[in-house]
């Protein structure tokens, strides 16, 4: 099932307990797409790969189950969590509602320092996306997707953390963890998906800069809703194909189309919504 290269080095987690280290290393392997939805997790193999006993692996699985990343079945059989199409639609309906609300509340009170941070994260994402569009090397692309995922999480987390409601923020974090296993796989196979998502981040950032909470919330809801067909396509076929996703309501992004999307976003933030 696994190889030692699949997990991050123990050295990175040297100040943690063994169980915490196992949790973090497994979580990274899952959210970065090295372990994919539905994949069986064999405790003894993981313990051997990480050079630990089975006990901390077993305890780590319980933590990951609470985060929604792992499903444990009778007789201690564990799998990377996966969702049905109906579950994806239900989960994203709730995410769209809550994350739209959190975004609106954040933009209503956002500070210059917080906007500056979002701009910095976006600019870093811009650099990664540029590389992904230029380079065909699988290793470089894989590393780029990992970097983009980290920045993507930072961008979204920063938008929700300042919403003024810790329970709303915590609930969003839990819901986002439920689909974290799908983020790398739906982006790894389609640069069109990466480009469209990045363009939507541009619109969201522009609305934040102009202090347009309702516009920002609307753009965030659109951003989330348009992720659903890609995840469902992965569930149906194993990985999303741009043409197939397009047939279910998505469209590829060419340079011209991306420019038009950005224009639309800029027009949106110039409306009279406050």
Q: Where do the language-model regions lie?
A:
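Short helix-capping/hinge motifs at transmembrane helix termini and TM-loop junctions
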Residues: 107-108, 164, 188
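Amphipathic alpha-helical repeat elements characteristic of tetratricopeptide repeat
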Residues: 20, 96, 119, 195-199
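Alpha-helix N-cap/N′ positions at the starts of helices
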Residues: 75, 98, 151, 196-199
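Short amphipathic alpha-helical segments at helix-loop
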Residues: 6-11, 38, 83, 136-140, ...
């Amino acid at each position: 099932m696994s190889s030692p290269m699949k997990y991050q080095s123990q050295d990175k987690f040297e100040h943690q307990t063994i169980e915490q280290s196992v949790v973090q290393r497994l979580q990274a392997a899952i959210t970065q797409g090295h372990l994919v939805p539905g994949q069986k997790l064999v405790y003894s193999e993981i313990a051997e790969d990480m050079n630990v006993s089975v006990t901390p692996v077993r305890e780590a699985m319980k933590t990951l189950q609470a985060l929604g990343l792992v499903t444990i079945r009778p007789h201690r059989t564990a799998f990377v969590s996966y969702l049905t199409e109906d579950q994806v639609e239900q989960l994203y309906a709730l995410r769209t509602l809550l994350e739209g609300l959190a975004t609106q509340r954040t933009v209503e009170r956002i500070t210059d320092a917080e906007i500056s941070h979002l701009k910095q994260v976006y600019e870093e994402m811009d650099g990664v996306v540029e590389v992904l569009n230029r380079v065909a090397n699988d290793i470089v692309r894989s590393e780029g997707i990992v970097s983009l995922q980290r920045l993507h999480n930072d961008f979204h987390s920063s938008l929700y953390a300042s919403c003024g409601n810790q329970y709303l923020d915590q609930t969003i974090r839990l819901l986002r963890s439920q689909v974290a296993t799908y983020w790398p796989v739906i982006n790894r196979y389609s640069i069109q998906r990466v480009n469209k998502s990045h363009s939507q981040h541009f619109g969201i950032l522009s609305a934040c800069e102009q202090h347009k909470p309702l516009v920002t919330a609307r753009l965030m809801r659109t951003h989330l809703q348009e992720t659903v067909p890609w995840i469902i396509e992965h569930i149906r076929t194993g990985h999303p194909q741009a043409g197939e996703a397009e047939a279910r309501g998505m469209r590829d992004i060419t340079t011209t189309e991306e420019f038009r999307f950005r224009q639309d976003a800029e027009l949106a933030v110039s409306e009279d919504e406050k």
